[in-house]
Amino acid sequence: MGDSELDYTIEFPEPSLQGWPWDPEREPVVILLGWGGCKDHYLAKYSAIYHNQGCTVIKYTAAWKAVFITESLGLNSLREDAKKLLELLFDYEIEKSPIVFHVFSNGGFMLYRYIVELLHSHCPLNKLHVVGTIFDSAPGNRNVIGSVRALDTILRTSTNKAFRFLALAAFAILVIILRILLYPLTRFLHENHYDAMKKDPSRWPQLYLYSRADPIISYLDVESMIAARRRRCLPTETLDFGKSEHVSHFRRFPQRYSEICTSFLRDCVRKASISMLRSEHPVSF
């Protein structure tokens, strides 16, 4: 089912761990969505934050070619990955657990866009119990320079300079034409992820971790998304780390980062549990 051709990692909490405030039958599941070009071991330090809290952790990163090429062409290439990822929760029989997403950069954000659409439209995926989402260095809105920098980081380790230059130039031209110049027309066929998520109907809390020093994702794009949610009175928390670079907030501020993620996780699960109890046992007068 969900694990067919999906390159993911899942870690279950240690049975010996005691003292966590979770229902032992419904321990939280945290799903990490890596940035474009991310390796599984890069996510290990983030996974440890939640694993040490007694959570089940799933790590998945979409293929960089899908993130930078097919999605730029307006093809919904990540939608099937999103569906398979959510189906894993049923495969492992943890579909009743509270779920938190931790989304990195636009690579994770693109995949999350399809996840949200499926959660609101596809049965039985719409039965899953999402309680919160954390965004790290996301989202960005049609930032050509930032996208080129991100792709350059990926290609730098595996291609020569001449090929990399040609690939980056072709990518930049493609994005400028399809996602900027022709976007007033192409958006009717494939709305970009940023615009689509500005209308996200999800009411669970969201936490945005970003930095004004990020050279790839503009803090103005992040703050515009934050403002859009707050105008709709949706629960939104933020932290501007100020000096850290792209997806480097944990590396620069490990204690602060861990504390806010842990606090957000616990708060989301607690509020969701209270809400569920009230719905199951309504007070009558």
Curated annotation (Swiss-Prot):
- One GO biological process term: negative regulation of BMP signaling pathway
* InterPro entries for the chain: AB_hydrolase_fold (IPR029058), DUF829_TMEM53 (IPR008547)
Localization (cell): Nucleus outer membrane
Superkingdom to which the source organism belongs: Eukaryota
* TM ranges: 165-185
Which GO CC terms are listed, alphabetically? nuclear membrane; nuclear outer membrane
Give the matching Gene3D superfamilies.
alpha/beta hydrolase
**Keywords noted in UniProt:** Developmental protein, Membrane, Nucleus, Transmembrane, Transmembrane helix
Look up and give the membrane topology term. Answer: Single-pass membrane protein
Q: What is its main location?
A: nucleus
In the record, the note on similarity to other proteins reads: Belongs to the TMEM53 family.
* Reported function: Ensures normal bone formation, through the negative regulation of bone morphogenetic protein (BMP) signaling in osteoblast lineage cells by blocking cytoplasm-nucleus translocation of phosphorylated SMAD proteins.
Q: What is this protein called?
A: Transmembrane protein 53-A
